[in-house]
Amino acid sequence: MKPPSIFNLFKKILDINSSKSKHIKKLISSGVKIVDINSVYIEDSVEILPGSVILPSTFLLGETKIESDSVIGPNTTISNSKIGKGSKVLYSIITDSKIGNNNQIGPFTYVRESTFTDSNVQLGNFVEVKTSNIGKESKSKHLAYIGDVKLENNVNIGAGTVVANFDGKTKHETSIKENVFIGSNSTIISPVIINSNSVVGAGSVVTKNVLSKETVVGNPARKLRK
């Protein structure tokens, strides 16, 4: 049996949407802008507030709620999640999570189950987040894995950073306090606490707690001597 062609998939979406046109028309009449109703799939259970824009090839599933003035898509799937006011989600997947106000998600971000972000968070290309809390103004813009982390406000996660949360048997949590800077290509071996206003130098491997206002570098990461 041949796999369905992209044309058949779009025909299926069109057929489904024709039966759901009442819900889509209701959304449009309420002030939601849907750029191409023939390429999106929006389940009846989805709530979208006025002022939001839904771009082509977007799938909105389950108990999803999109707050006002958000831009979703293109090529985005959101399932059982809440997207805060004024947020933008581009070429990304979000499942079972809550995104705060004025977030920028994507392109190519994967936000997995039980993730919560505060306001003004930025998660960029090829960043995966799972079961984590991300504080306001924090950012991870490139090529990172953040799993089982409590991330406080104004934290910068450099490109290539990995939080190694699984030891082969058990998942462990890491806590990163406010105003922490994590340099590129760092590895954080959970469970550790990286305290406020500290710096982890590029390429470091963190295996122990980092004190407040401390700078650590190396493998394993040690306090930088001045």
Predicted ranges, named:
Residues 17, 21-24, 38, 54-194, ...:
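Flexible, glycine/small-residue-enriched loop-and-beta-strand segment within the central core
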Residues 177, 211-212:
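Short coil/turn connectors at secondary-structure junctions
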Residues 205-207:
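Leucine-rich solenoid repeat scaffolds
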